[in-house]
Amino acid sequence: MKFFALFIYRPVATILLSVAITLCGILGFRMLPVAPLPQVDFPVIMVSASLPGASPETMASSVATPLERSLGRIAGVSEMTSSSSLGSTRIILQFDFDRDINGAARDVQAAINAAQSLLPSGMPSRPTYRKANPSDAPIMILTLTSDTYSQGELYDFASTQLAPTISQIDGVGDVDVGGSSLPAVRVGLNPQALFNQGVSLDDVRTAISNANVRKPQGALEDGTHRWQIQTNDELKTAAEYQPLIIHYNNGGAVRLGDVATVTDSVQDVRNAGMTNAKPAILLMIRKLPEANIIQTVDSIRAKLPELQETIPAAIDLQIAQDRSPTIRASLEEVEQTLIISVALVILVVFLFLRSGRATIIPAVAVPVSLIGTFAAMYLCGFSLNNLSLMALTIATGFVVDDAIVVLENIARHLEAGMKPLQAALQGTREVGFTVLSMSLSLVAVFLPLLLMGGLPGRLLREFAVTLSVAIGISLLVSLTLTPMMCGWMLKASKPREQKRLRGFGRMLVALQQGYGKSLKWVLNHTRLVGMVLLGTIALNIWLYISIPKTFFPEQDTGVLMGGIQADQSISFQAMRGKLQDFMKIIRDDPAVDNVTGFTGGSRVNSGMMFITLKPRDERSETAQQIIDRLRVKLAKEPGANLFLMAVQDIRVGGRQSNASYQYTLLSDDLAALREWEPKIRKKLATLPELADVNSDQQDNGAEMNLVYDRDTMARLGIDVQAANSLLNNAFGQRQISTIYQPMNQYKVVMEVDPRYTQDISALEKMFVINNEGKAIPLSYFAKWQPANAPLSVNHQGLSAASTISFNLPTGKSLSDASAAIDRAMTQLGVPSTVRGSFAGTAQVFQETMNSQVILIIAAIATVYIVLGILYESYVHPLTILSTLPSAGVGALLALELFNAPFSLIALIGIMLLIGIVKKNAIMMVDFALEAQRHGNLTPQEAIFQACLLRFRPIMMTTLAALFGALPLVLSGGDGSELRQPLGITIVGGLVMSQLLTLYTTPVVYLFFDRLRLRFSRKSKQTVTE
């Protein structure tokens, strides 16, 4: 009583306290960062190593395996995968959430150093690492195009000037430059001309290498001066290499231009990049795992004018893709939803109280509670994201509940003629414990979420803490500011009603009278109600088992990624044509705004595309509907497949794949894996629950297998090293010399001119100079035949691995796909030597599925414990918790009705319902107990009176919560995929629980009271005996 009086009779102090809370919240809001979701990125580090010319199998055994053994010893590594292709190996290390990325990077460098002695000696450089996840979609893509500069020159500007500067910006983890390679002098040899002149490829290589050197020449010095010696020992351009003498034949000089075409070109001609059908260089920027995407993008944009000034005016630098606009639009939508929710909640209060003066009180209490929460969010290191703003939207209905309960009870005393200050004190005292019970039990619901580990726990923590803080501030405001305002603002009489509102008042009275009559009938037919309650419990279990489930709602971020997978024997020229064809099909779609793509590198048969869709208000279809439409058109393109997926704000794992979900096959027997992977992939491709099934197993590439006749080689005076050097010189784009420039280093690349390597007969034109100086054709000592060879070798841990990726067809959920895959694996009878498991997001979904029921049970148990402590009773908490089955049924039925799978967002809705619907029961039980103790009423009379007296606040709080969540259901635009499942769950649960709990709660109350009396009689009889 004294606590309440302290604030009621000291209005200035109470007002200033509320102002202080509001000011702190405003300051916190201004400093809060903006993000699409809470920080849930796993720390990921990518290790790269190269050995030019080495086969994928050689890279896997000699480079990947030693590194994996050393890196696998690092503490906190949750997953390690590797992919080895022609000349390169990439190892992805995913760490536990609590692992510091900088500390992990130091351990990675130490592990690389420890493995250095086990790596091949021919590696051009030590393995390197980057603190970025290559499977993440870029946060921004910049393109460079020009009508005057070549692709190589553009690549040089991008990699030498732009990429290093962008990499230094806070939050940037990696800048990947694609679409071409660095400039180089290319020497394309004519094998027939070489044969005619008696010049070997090694002769050419040695001559070029000896003619382009950069060595110190020293200095001249006398008594007074010093002269640095400088020579023209370096050749810079193709024109300078052209006249180079490489051999003398019969006294005549054989120049390089006589046997080769020398051009200023690029290091690797098997690279191509495009933007909207125009050749381009792409800068794909990825953020650090812990970085804020909006802040990073803003920093890059602020740097762009300065970057533009560092490159020539003839180069066009454009932003081809930016992830931030849809994120900003989504957050704006949530903010608008929050404002609408606040307005609707206040409207509900006004309709019930029918007094503008009384409505001002919750209209003040709600903003104070919500704004004050921003200060706590800032102190906790949170951000303004979809989940935290959704928490505040839902909190609108909660925070007004406390004010409503206090306000309604005070208003009831005023209507009875009590003086305002006395009514404020008496009314607050009566419901103070009720409000405390409602708030503490609601916060208790989220305790299991706060203790939940892994990605789901990290994802939901901000939501739970934000909502809990809002409820805590609301509790303080409802017991201080609200009664003070009631005592000083409200009058001791019934408020005058406007004529337009009298109809609503009469309707409410009629509804209350009808409820009273129906409640009397229910209390006389308790068995029927008990059966209905048991039926709802059984229905809950059946609905939960049968409802489709997924991890996280599929988002429409306005960005698509596409992976091209062509025949494994395709040439680069043909692959570049496929890229152009696919880009044209997509670019012609009316919903597409921009398309960029690239192909080449170590995997010639693959490519990537990044597609920006038009804003949501400029297209009528969702990203998934656009993908479905494009899939039909793309399927008509022969020789290659383009797999599209919508970019998501959450992606788990470091595997780069062509689809959203992964299923990984592991085996210590590589032959068994290669035998069973095609069988499993073909089986999964037939399942209707899966779409876009593809695999990263590339073991069917075309190979020309040469077999040396060693005896013949020995007789002809040729060794294997000379023969291998011949092949590398001719076909390996061999880098034979370095050109040093002030800003960078460039290579001289030698190979047989592509004009002479169009078919297998090119091998017949190759020859080796033996130890007697004679030209020996390759065909004299080698035979060749076509064969198959892997384009890549993949590991997970230290086991051979193959990952099958898939998307979900429209109307199918991840639970459907998971069950279908498990059935297919059982039907195929896969041997124990081949193990299958879900990876990435699908793996987290499996783990979350196993913990969902436990989490719900833990929340219910926590609420029971809190209520038991508050009521000092084992029975009354059960009465209050009896409201939950009806809410669960309503929520699950609503999800089914809207064809929405049960996701992590829907789980949040279920947890919220546990806190919301029990409020009705708390108000009934509190007043019934009070009536029994002080009114000398029977239990049935007490609960009947409590139900009628609390009918208006129950309707007000329920409708406030319902209208607070309704904008989430009805909202469209960016980010609505996240908001709608939460709103659907809450609205569905509230509607069903309101219909049933008004009747089931009093019945359960009477049931447990009779049970209590029965046990007390037995106890008395036992004592008497």
From Swiss-Prot:
It holds the Pfam family ACR_tran. GO terms for cellular component: plasma membrane. The chain crosses the membrane at residues 7-29, 336-353, 360-379, 389-411, 431-453, 468-490, 853-875, 895-917, 948-970, 985-1007. This is Multidrug resistance protein MdtC. The keyword Cell membrane applies. Keywords: Cell inner membrane, Cell membrane, Membrane, Transmembrane, Transmembrane helix, Transport. It is a multi-pass membrane protein. It comes from Escherichia coli O157:H7. Induction: The mdtABC operon is transcriptionally activated by BaeR.
